[in-house]
């Protein structure tokens, strides 16, 4: 299609150019026809004499000397015309030749009047020659003129042939374009092609003419389709099978009335010849009355049927919506006589209640046009033979009043039943809503109970696991302490010169070396110093063990105290949210502390009604406290192992050097160690002294702490446990003194408070004591 469009564009361009040239050719052609005439038949042939070609060659010569621009615009025909046809009647073909007229006519010496006379003569001769040769008159023409005319005719013939060729080419192009356009029109009119093809053609064509033609074709097709649809609709409307039953009924009624009217007219027209005019008038009046009565009756019947239909619909709706449908449903199974009897009974009841109304209604004359079901059959009978006296007997008023009364009673019953139904529906909706609310509350209560049970179970399992871990850690701690005591007990007899005091013993060793050269010290002095050093070591070791145990017990008591405070705060919070819950009992909580396990198992007697963030926060606080305590216990155990291993290495490394030292040098470190250990004991007691009470805000982060009366049992329990634990090092004191000499057995170790040291700058190695745990940020 793109090639076709380019071809069409090129062809349209060529046609435009050819059309311009064609118009110019037509203009020149018409101009040539105005002065080119067929040659006159002369008796003398112009070919007997030789023509003179001076002027023609002169004109050609002058044309050759012309510039190129003017030469392109001149044709040989114009040159010949300008050179030889100076006396012709025709004017120059274009205004451009006026400028050429000056050089195509060379100047001559003949006067103007002679040239004008010659021109007039030649014009007369040509006019006479054009009308035909007249016998007896001779036409004289010069050979030069005849020759010029022949040349002009040949030139014109040649141009005509070129014009014919050009027209043939144009004709061929136009035929091709017409055939192509015919094909495109056939494609556009093809119904198998969709509108997309037309759109593509319109888009590819540069001009809007194709779009307009395509849209016109589309409009034409749409109009044809609309006409077809209208024809089908008209056929369906006129078809008998598609008409409405109500319309058919109305049409039949009108047809029946028209037939009846025509019958009456026919009967009246037949009886006109026999009856007088008075009877005719009476018959016409009676016919009018009958027709009006018939119309009124048909209208009344139609209204009654509509009312009956609406009442039936209301009754069906009432029966379907009423709750007492089980009672009324039996009427549907009754037979027609039974229903009629029931209606008669109801009518009697209504008539008994409305007896005064009936007496007044009987006095009134019945209307002949009363609406009653018995009038339905009247319209189907011919009314020609009926008289106006028979009409009042058609519809009794009594039956109509009975029916109206029954209808009123039924409507009242319907209203009452509908009100009852609405009340019952409202009650049922309220009951259903309350049932749904109760079910939701029950479901939430069940879910809360289930979650509470699961939480209690998880807390119990976690508490059991934590107590087991605490027991295991306490046992491991005891074993490590026992092993450390055994190692130190084995290492005491060999500790003659401890390494931490080596720098203090250096000057003593120098002094002793100086004294050794002069005189030897007495033996009893060295033995006394050794005994004093042994007693100092025993006292320091016992004090260290007692402090270590007290620090561990204080730490455990602090942790338990914080846990109990968190538990009491949590129970207080739960008690404030659940008023009917029982208050926690502190003796029940503290009873497991009297057992042997260091970390008692505390079970919460109060189960919260529902999970809340404060309860979870309290549980997290207790868990963090217990985990911190376990981590501290592990760290203390690892430190004890390292201290035991380092003490064993020191005793092994110091045993040979200590045995080689003299007695005087062995006794001096004992005194120094006694003083240094006393200062270390004072520092450790000040550092490891536990706080009497840890605020609950530091442990759990809550502001409401339990009262002091509820926590009195915790310090007392702590003191009792400390006394039980402190009794073990007192009993272990003599066992540590067993490796000492027998004369030192009755000596009792001095109290820690009596040992004092003025030298606080000296540093000795002492076993590691656990730091006091800082208050937990939880």
UniProtKB/Swiss-Prot annotation:
Compositionally biased spans, kind Low complexity: 37-49, 352-362, 581-598
Stored CDD domains: IQCD (cd23767)
IQ domain ranges (all copies): 553-582, 615-644
Coiled-coil blocks: 157-323, 398-486
Highest taxon listed in the record's lineage: Eukaryota
Pfam families noted in UniProt: IQ
Transmembrane segments: none
Disordered: annotated span: 1-71, 83-108, 348-392, 443-462, 474-529, 573-612, 651-778
Subcellular location: Cell projection, Cilium membrane
Positions with biased composition (Polar residues): 83-101, 651-662
UniProt-listed InterPro entries: CellDiv_DevSignal_Domain, IQ_motif_EF-hand-BS, P-loop_NTPase
Membrane topology of this protein: Peripheral membrane protein
GO CC annotation: ciliary membrane; cytoplasmic side of plasma membrane; mitochondrion; plasma membrane protein complex
Keyword Zinc-finger: no
GO terms for biological process, alphabetical: limb morphogenesis; positive regulation of transcription by RNA polymerase II; protein localization to motile cilium; regulation of smoothened signaling pathway
Compositionally biased intervals (Pro residues): 739-752
PROSITE patterns: IQ
Keywords noted in UniProt: Cell membrane, Cell projection, Coiled coil, Membrane, Phosphoprotein, Repeat
Residues with PTM Phosphoserine: 322, 661
Composition bias, Basic and acidic residues: 672-686
Main location: membrane
Assembly mode: Component of the EvC complex composed of EFCAB7, IQCE, EVC2 and EVC; built from two subcomplexes, EVC2:EVC and EFCAB7:IQCE. Interacts (via N-terminus) with EFCAB7 (via EF-hands 1 and 2); this interaction anchors the EVC-EVC2 complex in a signaling microdomain at the base of cilia and stimulates the Hedgehog (Hh) pathway. Interacts with EVC2 (via N-terminal end). Interacts with EVC.
Reported function: Component of the EvC complex that positively regulates ciliary Hedgehog (Hh) signaling. Required for proper limb morphogenesis.
Name the record gives this protein: IQ domain-containing protein E
Encoding gene per record: Iqce
